């Protein structure tokens, strides 16, 4: 598995110009459709007066009137222009207009032209013949042999429809009968023929498609790809608009080398909360080249995301993902996980919240994908947390209290299980004046463990009862200084020094948890935290509560910021810090868990916006123990608009740093990652995304992508080519020098019905195992 150590490689593409593509394309498309002139009337138009103008009129009161020569009839939003019009009135509530010869009809929804028509002036119904029509204010036009118009529907015989503009026959749909539902925003067709450039390519006895941007049930645009690993991939989604507050998508994926996969996704928003319920299921995976023999050929994923607030102060959060096997995300592209994640989270939390306290019960489990150790992380169920806050405890002091009860269980019979009871009172006394702030904090960690030996006979012995009490004292000084003279003219400089002292006595914690399986962490839920400038000022080196290292240390750091005097915007910042250990920090008697040196790594963070459209970020760590660089990364981005971006990235991790922080290291050398990506709208119709990632230490490419989108007013096309690092096939060599790739190719077309003008850039940037990420720490 080399994907987790994948790296970037330089990819530079120059672009000539950019525009707000979506807005420009929409403007160009709508510029060529008719628009309603004047102010739209929303009142009941049946009771509004009818205005008639003509060159000549012969009126036979009260039953008949004949008008000829430039006849114009107006009532509310609708207007009629005709050569000759005869109006008959059999009764006060029965008035009809016969349009003889050529006519034009227009209201706020449709414009039509044809020969001979009958209009009911009382009900707004109309019967037309040999007509061409164009929707008003939106794309959509067609022809019909005959039709019946009502305020709710337009029923057409031997009709056609297309969202393409005039003189563009890229695609059209013809049907024996068509019903356009005006308010609902969709059309139904019977005996429909789909044509491309007037050539019929598809027939359906029934078809439904949208006329606007309202959600409608129906078949969505399919996708077709080819992969050297999976073969031909055909994806056909179906959308079901169940109700205004819930819908679903059913996607059927066909892999020529694997079989059929069914992917349902249900979305809801109810009084019981909002969320997503989804699944992916492949009954029989035929591709055993990438599936171990002991792995079931039934591949599946289940995902549930739910948020709920109820009874004012209660909140429920569920995030649950489960997969059939550890290689699932390596074999299938999924919206609910990525091959680089390393695990699937299974978590729930029910909480009660008040201004001064909160109480919650939760559970957490991790479905890990590593195959290095049969022992997996601990499952926490239940975990009960209590927090209490009081701002005015003694004068200006602040008191807080944290308590937790947690049960840890492991699926491995050789691992111990435990109950943990923890209490943590905290008192903060701040001293603030115009020189700065000094915060004095005292804290007590009080923990009690009830441990149980694993059920296997070979399980290691553990101490059944264990109590650990650790006091802590912390002083944290911060101030903000404004320089009288900045280093650079036109900028205001701010200096933010920070000095922190932390003291905790040493307690041997080697009896907490297992001693022989540190690959799952230390104790039950602790792991060494990655360090950067901001983490230097954390209280602890380890996550969780099972490892609380001794501390007698001083952390010193400073940040300086430069602000543009004219705009007030932050332009540049840099932060430098280091921790000095007055005594080594320990959690047990092992040297590997101790800070032998007197000082930590130097940490540097910097951000620079040297132009409004340019951003630069860098971080660096120098390990004083190793006497070499341990971590470094840099990112440079040019982003002139929301859909135009160019980014270069570099990341370095020292091999010794990896060995120090991981109990296993299959990489065996430094990580050196370099690469770049570009997403650019070349014109209003053409958008491109390209990326290349390379491991310069191993001299191997990790991922190369090229995606090209062509957009018009009524259709779009996407070309996608990729070469991606994939997992090692079963039985193949698996060393740091062996790489295996999956080549992908696809061309997809999408019909547009006049409500989507996007360039597709967001979708293109999210593709790949290393998608686009924007992260710059500047205000």
Curated annotation (Swiss-Prot):
Keywords: Cell outer membrane, Membrane, Signal
Primary site of residence: membrane
Compartments, as annotated in UniProt: Cell outer membrane
InterPro entries tied to this protein: LipoPS_assembly_LptD, LptD, LptD_C, OstA-like_N
CC annotations in GO: cell outer membrane; transporter complex
Pfam (any one): LptD
Keyword Membrane assigned: yes
Gene Ontology biological process terms, A to Z: Gram-negative-bacterium-type cell outer membrane assembly; lipopolysaccharide transport
Signal peptide region: 1-23
PANTHER family: LPS-ASSEMBLY PROTEIN, LPS-ASSEMBLY PROTEIN LPTD
Quaternary structure note: Component of the lipopolysaccharide transport and assembly complex. Interacts with LptE and LptA.
Function according to Swiss-Prot or TrEMBL: Together with LptE, is involved in the assembly of lipopolysaccharide (LPS) at the surface of the outer membrane.
HAMAP family for the chain: LPS_assembly_LptD
Family note: Belongs to the LptD family.
Protein known as: LPS-assembly protein LptD
Organism listed in the record: Haemophilus ducreyi (strain 35000HP / ATCC 700724)
């Amino acid at each position: 598995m080399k994907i987790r150590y994948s790296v970037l490689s330089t990819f530079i593409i120059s672009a000539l110009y950019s525009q707000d593509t979506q807005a420009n394309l929409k403007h160009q498309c709508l510029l060529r459709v008719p628009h309603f002139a004047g102010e739209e009337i929303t009142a009941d138009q049946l009771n509004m007066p009818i205005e008639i103008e003509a060159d000549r009129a012969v009126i036979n009161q009260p039953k008949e009137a004949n008008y000829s020569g430039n006849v114009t009839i107006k009532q509310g939003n609708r207007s009629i222009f005709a050569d000759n019009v005869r109006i008959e009135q059999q009764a006060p509530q029965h008035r009809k207009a016969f349009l003889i010869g050529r006519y034009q009809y227009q209201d706020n929804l449709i414009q039509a032209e044809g020969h001979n028509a009958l209009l009911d002036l009382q009900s707004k119904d109309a019967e037309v013949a040999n007509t061409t029509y164009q929707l008003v204010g939106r794309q959509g036009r067609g022809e019909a042999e005959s039709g019946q118009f009502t305020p709710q529907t337009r029923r057409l015989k031997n009709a056609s429809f297309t969202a393409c503009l005039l003189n563009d026959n890229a695609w059209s749909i013809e049907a024996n009968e068509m019903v356009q539902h005006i308010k609902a925003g969709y059309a139904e067709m019977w005996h429909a023929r789909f044509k491309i450039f007037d050539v019929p390519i598809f027939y359906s006895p029934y078809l439904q498609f949208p006329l606007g941007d309202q959600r409608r049930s129906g078949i969505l645009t399919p996708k077709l790809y080819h992969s050297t690993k999976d073969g031909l991939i055909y994806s056909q989604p179906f959308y079901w608009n169940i109700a205004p507050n819930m819908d679903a998508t059913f996607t059927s994926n066909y892999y020529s080398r694997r079989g059929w996969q069914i992917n349902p996704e249900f979305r809801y928003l109810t009084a019981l909360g909002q969320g997503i319920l989804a699944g992916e299921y492949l009954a029989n995976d035929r591709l055993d080249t990438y599936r171990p023999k002991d792995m079931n050929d039934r591949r599946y994923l289940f995902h549930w995301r739910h948020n709920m607030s109820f009874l004012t102060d209660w909140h429920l959060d569920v995030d649950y993902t489960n997969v059939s096997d550890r290689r699932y995300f390596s074999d299938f592209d999924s919206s609910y996980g990525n091959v680089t994640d390393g695990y699937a989270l299974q978590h729930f939390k029910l909480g009660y919240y008040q201004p001064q306290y909160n109480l919650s019960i939760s559970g957490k489990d991790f479905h890990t994908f590593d195959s290095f150790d049969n022992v997996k992380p601990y499952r926490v169920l239940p975990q009960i947390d209590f927090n209490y806050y009081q701002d005015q405890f003694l004068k200006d002091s602040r008191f807080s209290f944290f308590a937790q009860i947690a049960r840890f269980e492991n699926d491995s019979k050789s691992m111990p299980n435990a109950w943990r009871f923890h209490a943590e009172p905290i008192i903060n006394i701040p001293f603030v004046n115009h020189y700065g702030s000094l915060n004095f904090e005292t804290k007590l960690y009080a923990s009690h463990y009830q441990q149980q030996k694993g059920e296997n006979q070979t399980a290691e012995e553990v101490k059944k009862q264990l109590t650990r009490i650790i006091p802590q004292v912390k002083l944290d000084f911060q101030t903000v200084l404004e320089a009288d003279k900045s280093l650079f003219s036109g900028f205001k400089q701010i200096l933010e020094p920070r000095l922190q002292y932390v003291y905790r006595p040493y307690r041997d914690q080697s009896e907490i948890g297992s001693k022989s399986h540190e690959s799952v962490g230390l104790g039950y839920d602790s792991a060494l935290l990655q360090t950067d400038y901001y983490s230097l000022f954390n209280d602890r080196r380890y996550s969780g509560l099972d490892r609380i290292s001794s501390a007698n240390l001083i952390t010193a750091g400073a940040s300086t910021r430069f602000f543009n005097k004219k705009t007030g915007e932050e332009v540049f910042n840099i932060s430098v810090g280091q921790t000095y250990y007055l005594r080594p920090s320990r959690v047990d008697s092992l040297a590997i868990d101790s800070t032998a040196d007197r000082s930590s790594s130097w940490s540097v963070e910097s951000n620079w916006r040297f132009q409004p459209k340019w951003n630069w970020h860098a971080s660096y760590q120098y390990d004083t123990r190793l006497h070499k660089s341990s971590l470094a990364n840099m990112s440079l981005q040019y982003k002139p608009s929301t859909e135009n971006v160019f980014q270069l990235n570099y990341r370095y991790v020292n091999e010794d740093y990896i060995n120090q922080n991981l109990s296993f290291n299959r990489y065996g050398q430094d990580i050196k990652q370099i690469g770049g990506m570009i997403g650019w709208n070349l014109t209003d119709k053409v958008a491109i995304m390209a990326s290349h990632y390379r491991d310069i230490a191993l001299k191997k490419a990790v991922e190369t992508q090229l995606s090209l989108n062509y957009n018009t007013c009524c259709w779009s096309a996407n070309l996608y080519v990729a070469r991606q690092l994939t997992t090692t096939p079963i039985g193949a060599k698996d060393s740091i020098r062996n790489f295996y790739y999956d080549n992908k190719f696809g061309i997809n077309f999408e019909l547009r019905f006049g409500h989507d003008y996007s360039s597709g850039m967001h979708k293109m940037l999210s593709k790949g195992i290393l998608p686009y990420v924007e992260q710059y720490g500047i205000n």
